[in-house]
Curated annotation (Swiss-Prot):
Protein name: Shikimate dehydrogenase (NADP(+))
InterPro entries: Aminoacid_DH-like_N_sf (IPR046346), NAD(P)-bd_dom_sf (IPR036291), SDH_C (IPR041121), Shikimate_DH (IPR011342), Shikimate_DH-bd_N (IPR013708), Shikimate_DH_fam (IPR022893)
Entry keywords, A to Z: Amino-acid biosynthesis, Aromatic amino acid biosynthesis, NADP, Oxidoreductase
Gene: aroE
Signal peptide span: none
Source organism (scientific name): Gloeothece citriformis (strain PCC 7424) (Cyanothece sp. (strain PCC 7424))
NCBIfam families recorded: aroE, PRK00258.2-2
Length: 288
């Protein structure tokens, strides 16, 4: 850990709860590696205190900060500008100081895309199937659209929530590419997709013996398809283990976490960030 002085610049993450965040681990590992005079700390902020907290961060000279649950949407009215990506996702996870106030973006889209882009596939011919229709699914939908996928299928458990999810993309070019399906349609979708993405929490502790996809359905996955789980612990999840048994290429959520963090840190410190240091710090911390 670098020596903290009167010149040390402050970064952080705000959430409720925030004690389980891995952001301080990976950001401080890179700060130490680059020998920067910064420190990254977690701030527990309740929803009703968000406005006061943001004013406080501004007053004490914080350079920038991340947001986690439940603040990714409610922060938006408190910012002077947000990026086009953040507007599409409807959530901000990274904020930095400007002359006109706070600006925000969403680095989850970049984080999600980074491991996929290395595969150099003809993405316009890939029709991803996304499990779940919550906040994480929104970043994945935007990422798939930015990658050039022409048809994006989102699978959920309740028609009302799916309809709301679909309508939320009105007046955006994404809605034309979007299809929504109920869970019972999954067998047919899995058999045809080249990219299956889990954005649900199924498979995380304490439900590590569960998968969002039944094994009978997973057996329909084509060999060589990609299975991507946004969950990073356990590593691998049951979802990824069973996909790998079908001959799938598997991607876990650890690189997405590191890549979105690296982009955020590069915005704040205005220099490139070694993603591999972030990834390794997470693997060391999680004993992976």
């Amino acid at each position: 850990m670098p020596l903290i002085t009167g010149k040390t610049k402050l970064l952080g993450v705000i959430g409720d709860p925030v004690e389980h965040s891995l952001s301080p681990v990976m950001h401080n590992a890179v700060i130490d590696h680059l020998n920067l005079n910064y420190i990254y700390v977690p701030f527990a902020v309740k929803p009703e205190d968000l406005r006061t907290a943001i004013a406080g961060l501004e007053a004490i000279g914080v350079v920038g900060f991340n947001l986690t649950i439940p603040h990714k949407q409610t922060i938006i009215p408190l910012l002077s500008t947000i990026s086009e990506t953040a507007q599409l996702v409807g959530a901000v996870n990274t904020v930095w100081r400007t002359e006109t106030g706070w600006s925000g973006t969403n680095t989850d889209v970049h984080g999600f895309l980074a491991p996929l882009k290395r595969l150099n596939l003809p993405w316009s011919q890939v029709s991803p199937v996304i499990l779940g229709n919550g906040g994480a699914a929104r970043a994945v939908v935007v990422g798939c659209y930015e990658m050039g996928c022409r048809q994006i299928s989102v699978v959920g458990r309740t028609k009302e929530k799916l309809d709301h999810f679909y309508q939320s993309w009105q007046n955006t070019p994404i809605q034309e590419a979007l299809r929504v399906y109920l869970w019972e349609d999954l067998p047919q979708l899995v058999s045809k997709t080249q990219l299956l993405i889990n954005t649900t929490p199924l498979g995380m502790s304490p439900h590590i013996d569960q998968s969002p996809v039944d094994l009978t359905v997973m057996k329909k996955l084509q060999p060589g398809a990609i299975a991507y789980d946004l969950i990073y612990t356990p590593n691998p999840t049951l979802f990824l283990k069973e996909a790998q048994q079908q001959g799938a290429i598997i991607i876990d959520g650890l690189e997405m976490l590191a890549q979105q963090g690296a982009l955020a840190l590069s915005i704040w410190i205005k220099q490139s960030v070694p993603v591999e240091i972030m990834s390794q710090s997470l693997r060391d911390y999680l004993n992976l």
